[in-house]
UniProtKB/Swiss-Prot annotation:
This is 4-hydroxy-2-oxo-heptane-1,7-dioate aldolase. Binds 1 divalent metal cation per subunit. It comes from Salmonella paratyphi A (strain AKU_12601). A divalent metal cation binds at E149, D175. Its cofactor is a divalent metal cation. The gene is hpcH.
Length: 263
């Protein structure tokens, strides 16, 4: 079994991604052909469930873009279900400390290395027990990315990085800026300093740093600092802003009173 996304991170090859929030397999397939290295299927803030994640995984599968799935929480039951439908790479939100990071890793591993429940006869991941020795191969194919998005998590970054089985650490700029007192302003100098320091620290520890940033200059800055998986846009934002721009060219008035950024 292979995980191309995990292999790319291990090799130090930067991966450029797009966030999927439309919760739709048709749009997921459309974007899978756009040329991004990875696509994030968001189960935290988008209206996804196990069934909609499954159909998006199926839609993306024929394309080179690699799927990354974010559950709504660091919950072993939810993680088990997502792995069984075929997710191999998970982005676990709001991880605050090393214990929570260890719990995330354990949820992705079969015993004795972890606590993932065995149900491979029912699972797309094992191709319904058609993958020989799946139970012994699956653990090494899992890629665990944890999200740090508060000052508390930042203060615990060193111990999180020491957890075996963590492949990457994703900095959540929206929640981090809010926690630091700069809600809606992830480009504030204090937030940017925290992000840049974290990227350097994560890479120095031999892990892959990641982030979502639609500002092209900042995204390139993070890549220069060593970020290895960077999402550079969100499908809902691309659709909304693109539609508004087209309407505006024909005289429509935009109502952007609630717009506060890409995410």
């Amino acid at each position: 079994m292979k995980n191309a996304f995990k292999d790319a991170l291990k090799a130090g090859r930067p991966q450029i991604g797009l966030w999927l929030g439309l919760a739709n397999s048709y749009s997921a397939e459309l974007l899978a052909g756009a040329g991004f290295d990875w696509l994030l299927i968001d189960g935290e803030h988008a209206p996804n469930n196990v069934q909609t994640v499954l159909t998006q995984l199926q839609a993306i599968a024929p394309y080179p873009s690699q799927p990354v799935v974010r559950p709504s929480w660091n919950d072993p039951v939810q993680i088990k279900q997502l792995l069984d439908v075929g997710a191999q790479t998970l982005l676990i939100p709001m991880v605050q400390n090393a214990d929570e990071a260890r719990n995330a890793v354990a949820a992705t591993r079969y015993p004795p290395a972890g606590i993932r429940g065995v149900g491979s006869a029912l699972a797309r991941a094992s191709r319904w027990n058609r993958i020989p020795d799946y139970l012994h191969l699956a653990n090494d194919a899992m890629c665990v990315l944890v999200q740090i998005e508060t000052r508390e998590a930042m203060s615990n970054l060193a111990s999180i990085l020491d957890v075996d089985g963590i492949d990457g650490v994703f900095i959540g700029p929206a929640d981090l800026s809010a926690d630091m007192g700069f809600a809606g302003n992830p480009q504030h100098p204090e937030v940017q300093a925290a992000i840049e320091n974290a990227i350097v620290q994560i890479r120095a520890a031999g892990k892959a740093p990641g982030i979502l940033m639609a500002n092209e200059a900042l995204a390139k800055r993070y890549l220069e600092l060593g970020a290895l998986f960077v999402a550079v846009g969100v499908d809902t934002t691309l659709l909304a802003r693109g539609a508004e721009a087209l309407a505006a060219r024909f005289g429509a008035e935009k109502n952007l009173s609630g717009a506060s950024g890409v995410y």
